[in-house]
Amino acid sequence: MKIYLVGGAVRDALLGLPVKDRDWVVVGSTPQEMLDAGYQQVGRDFPVFLHPQTHEEYALARTERKSGSGYTGFTCYAAPDVTLEDDLKRRDLTINALAQDDNGEIIDPYNGLGDLQNRLLRHVSPAFGEDPLRVLRVARFAARYAHLGFRIADETLALMREMTHAGELEHLTPERVWKETESALTTRNPQVFFQVLRDCGALRVLFPEIDALFGVPAPARWHPEIDTGIHTLMTLSMAAMLSPQVDVRFATLCHDLGKGLTPPELWPRHHGHGPAGVKLVEQLCQRLRVPNEIRDLARLVAEFHDLIHTFPMLNPKTIVKLFDSIDAWRKPQRVEQLALTSEADVRGRTGFESADYPQGRWLREAWEVAQSVPTKAVVEAGFKGVEIREELTRRRIAAVASWKEQRCPKPD
């Protein structure tokens, strides 16, 4: 029996990145030997075991053979005669097909070290094309390691295109698509994930609402980058700098979906694109089964981001109504989330990357003023039932009006 550290732990250690999870491959053993040694079996379809002390995963070396459609249609073979090289060959990328023995020696049968050095994401073998989930995984790796200068090998991108055009991605379940997307949204450069999907044709298949934005012009005066698809990826990049939250990043990604519905004869104007985009947000989220909390913020951002851009022109009543509309009294975090997504929208434009966004500050200040109006004082003043809410709203409007007079500049 020989045990090797494999995959991501080896890769990230070589890149000088923190190692989170360690996975091991066991060569020359059987399930019974593992159980006799005190390991606990957890894999139903293939033999994976938990170490009795560390609870890290130890898998018997195995091969996989395509036996059906999609990413689940595989038959596994695990036996003592399966070599380490056999096991590593079934992995997706060469940089993930590295192993380390107990002496610290690196085993590299597929030139993963060379590809690490050259910052290349390259598939190990043609078997890559049998698993459509790998298209999303490679896009996610491209986003995860973009800051280190990684790029996808030309032949791998070509294979991803072939898989997409062959309809392989249609076998992916919504849950898996969202899981990979959510993971990509946590990376330093989530926009790269969507750019890669576009480069291989997968964006049109999985995110048609986003793909439809490319080639749609916006007024050059406000959008020097002109193309709404490019603007969308720029805003996502900016959102990633402003917030680590998936909610904020996803909402930013979806903020301009309504522009994809504008008839070409009305271009480059997009009046009413915010409310129009709400239905597309709902459509996308329903299809991918996006969690409700993430979906709800994306809907609100689509509907209200342009309103926040015009904050100095809003009257106090409209400002308080905005807080009502986003349910800020019960979910105060939404004020900050809306401020960040709106800022990402403004700064996600060519030449505006370092622009100030005072509207975000004013939104936060107005919220602090509105929420500081005490409910208790209204009740103690003798108001009852529905009168309490009406009086509370009236006092909040008055407080915001007073603040606006002193702190928020009047529009020209």
UniProtKB/Swiss-Prot annotation:
It holds the Pfam family HD. The keyword tRNA processing applies. It catalyses: a tRNA precursor + 2 CTP + ATP = a tRNA with a 3' CCA end + 3 diphosphate; a tRNA with a 3' CCA end + 2 CTP + ATP = a tRNA with a 3' CCACCA end + 3 diphosphate. It comes from the Bacteria. CTP binds at residues 8, 11, 91, 137, 140. Residues 228-329 form the HD domain. Comprises two domains: an N-terminal domain containing the nucleotidyltransferase activity and a C-terminal HD domain associated with both phosphodiesterase and phosphatase activities. Monomer. Can also form homodimers and oligomers. Belongs to the tRNA nucleotidyltransferase/poly(A) polymerase family. Bacterial CCA-adding enzyme type 1 subfamily. HAMAP family: CCA_bact_type1, CCA_bact_type2. NCBIfam families: PRK10885.1. This is Multifunctional CCA protein.
